[in-house]
Amino acid sequence: MRPRAAGFTLIEVLLATMLLVGGLALAFATLRSASAISQRGEAIAQRSERTRAVEEFLRRRLSAALPIAMGIDTQSQQPMLFVGEPQRMRFAADVPDYLGRGGPYLHDVSVVGDGEQRTLTIALTMLQSGKEIEEGNALPAETLADDVQQVSFRYRGLDPQSGALSGWLPQWEWHDRLPLLVRIDIRSGGAAWPPVVVALPQSGGGGALAQ
């Protein structure tokens, strides 16, 4: 019998090649999976960071709300200190210099659009003696959150007639006073944000008008 020649047979080479190709395919699949997981993780982290930033901004602006007149209610003829609707609220608060010229500004927080692609925006307008002052370099409304499916604002405060604490109201009817609490619920990307509940320190329990 002739001895077997040294080296690999064609079958062995083919098997080794198939194993190598299979190993490379598995390695590339693992890399793609890891890359996809990493990208999803980064996207989630960015959304979470954006959510926290928007929540903190809203908390700071609402907690800075002041009992300063933004105009006169045409029905009651009383100064308007706070206007709260299901998807819009308007109030006065001082702003830091990087947001404007300092001093009180009208904050107009509203939901734009409908359906599944709504946008939460804020517009700032200078206030002087209860009147809106248009600035020459006024900034347009800023986007706080886009691609939002649902946004709702609710308000809680003292009923001026009974003096009792109200439940959560979709409409703040007493424009001549600040609510005690404001709640904001946002849903985007198929998930609900943590509810934002803010106490308004300057409400004073009844929102007395600042002189």
From Swiss-Prot:
GO terms for biological process: protein transport. Belongs to the GSP J family. Residues 1-7 form a propeptide. Its main location: membrane. It is found in: Membrane. The modification N-methylphenylalanine is found at residue 8. It is a single-pass membrane protein. The chain crosses the membrane at residues 8-28. This is Type II secretion system protein J. GO terms for cellular component: membrane. Involved in a type II secretion system (T2SS, formerly general secretion pathway, GSP) for the export of proteins. Keywords: Membrane, Methylation, Protein transport, Transmembrane, Transmembrane helix, Transport.
